[in-house]
From Swiss-Prot:
Gene: emtA
Organism superkingdom: Bacteria
Cell membrane keyword on record: no
Name the UniProt record assigns to this protein: Endo-type membrane-bound lytic murein transglycosylase A
Known catalytic reactions: Endolytic cleavage of the (1->4)-beta-glycosidic linkage between N-acetylmuramic acid (MurNAc) and N-acetylglucosamine (GlcNAc) residues in peptidoglycan with concomitant formation of a 1,6-anhydrobond in the MurNAc residue
Xref: SUPFAM superfamilies: Lysozyme-like (SSF53955)
One annotated GO biological process: peptidoglycan metabolic process
Organism: Escherichia coli O127:H6 (strain E2348/69 / EPEC)
Length: 203
């Protein structure tokens, strides 16, 4: 798999020389993954509750916060899975039937943060991304949507959600990555997929 991944990157980058090279600078996932793995018992519990692969949760923790539960970004994304209270946090609260949004202290609590991150992944999978058939493509779509929003991803295929999902189902994982690299408005979107693969390989 690693050789296939490397060979694909060479071909893709050769064909996209005018695009941002999302593999540079190289990202060493070893330390972030080691730090994220300490939260695996919580990730397993949250994954079981929400039907999300705990390895995917761990990879997102490694990418988003490097395993630091107190991490706060410039855009005020908070905690291990870098949840924004006013967007994904509010969506999770709504799914749970609660009003308002999570507090900063709640988002810095590892168990609450991971639970909300897993819940949000479930919201994406059963909502805007519902119908994606290939498990690997779904995994890629989940992380791109987690980082940059499902709407931004789907609009690169069609303004109509059903048509977008149908077009996604015509692609394998490598073709999906190439589409994201060529068409997604956020340069970090394909890099997130690159980091995901690095993190999964480091586990």
């Amino acid at each position: 798999m690693k050789l296939r991944w490397f060979a694909f990157l060479i071909v893709l980058l050769a064909g996209c020389s005018s695009k941002h090279d999302y593999t540079n600078p190289p990202w060493n996932a070893k330390v972030p993954v080691q730090r994220a793995m300490q939260w695996m018992p919580i990730s397993q519990k949250a994954g079981a509750a929400w039907g999300v692969d705990p390895q995917l949760i761990t990879a997102i923790i490694a990418i988003e916060s490097g395993g630091n539960p107190n991490a706060v970004s410039k855009s005020n994304a908070i905690g291990l899975m870098q949840i924004k209270a006013s967007t994904s946090g509010r969506d999770v609260y709504r799914r749970m039937g609660w009003s308002g949004e999570p507090t900063t202290s709640e988002l810095k609590n590892p168990e609450r943060n991971i639970s909300m991150g897993a819940a949000y992944l479930n919201i994406l999978e059963t909502g805007p991304l519902a119908g994606i058939e290939d498990p690997k493509v779904l995994q890629y779509a989940l992380v791109v949507s987690y980082a940059n929003g499902a709407g931004a991803l789907l609009r690169t295929f069609s303004s109509d959600r059903k048509k977008a999902i149908s077009k996604i189902n015509d692609l394998d994982a490598d073709e999906f990555l190439e589409h994201v690299a060529r068409n997604h408005p956020a340069p970090q979107a394909p890099r997130y997929i690159y980091k995901l693969e690095q993190a999964l390989d480091a586990m």
